[in-house]
């Protein structure tokens, strides 16, 4: 399992539980040149506890480990807990460019967030972007040593959610459920995924970001673009 940011949808936007401070000299330089070091910046943000905003993208690689084979018959989001959107620091870097392709998705606001087919003729944010229950009509068999890669999107419109993936597999004549999180580099245990909806009003008016304690905005007047501090009480996109 690994994260796969889609900058065409997510841009460089991140949220934090608290402050982005303190910042070292190197941290400040990375913020100042974030658009020129996108991968490094995103890894740095995740390492500081940064949380995806509105949507998370990831790739799940499942490998067959039984001689007789297994079959993936179900996948759903296992919610640990949800609450109000994060209002610590927001790094606001809206997207520019095309979005990538995704296979299945979870709507974390659903009462039962099963894996749903992403409609290829829809864009993120469109009505019916997520369609039918993917595994209602699909079963994925895995032979010993065979890999299957799932491109996954998870969304929320109104909450902060902490969650895992529950994978249902048919093996040795019965069903088993496997709970999957992600493993931070250098960490032996797995952690839950996190995603938060934006807490601001999204109306483009002055003061619409005032709910945040800190705000950093991507300044595209420079090349490469970087983040500069802004007053959340007065900033307007």
Model feature map: region roles:
Residues 106-130, 165-237:
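Acidic, serine/threonine- and proline-rich intrinsically disordered appendage/tail regions
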Residues 89-95, 183-184:
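Solvent-exposed serine/threonine-rich low-complexity stretches and specific carbohydrate-binding patches
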Residues 78, 92-166, 174-177:
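Short helix-loop boundary/capping segments
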Residues 35-43, 109-111:
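Long, low-complexity, largely intrinsically disordered segments
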Residues 65-90, 175:
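Acidic (Asp/Glu-rich), glycine- and aromatic
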Residues 42-53, 63-70:
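Short, solvent-exposed beta-strand/turn "edge" segments of beta-rich domains on protein surfaces
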Residues 1-39:
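N-terminal leader/pro-regions and domain N-caps
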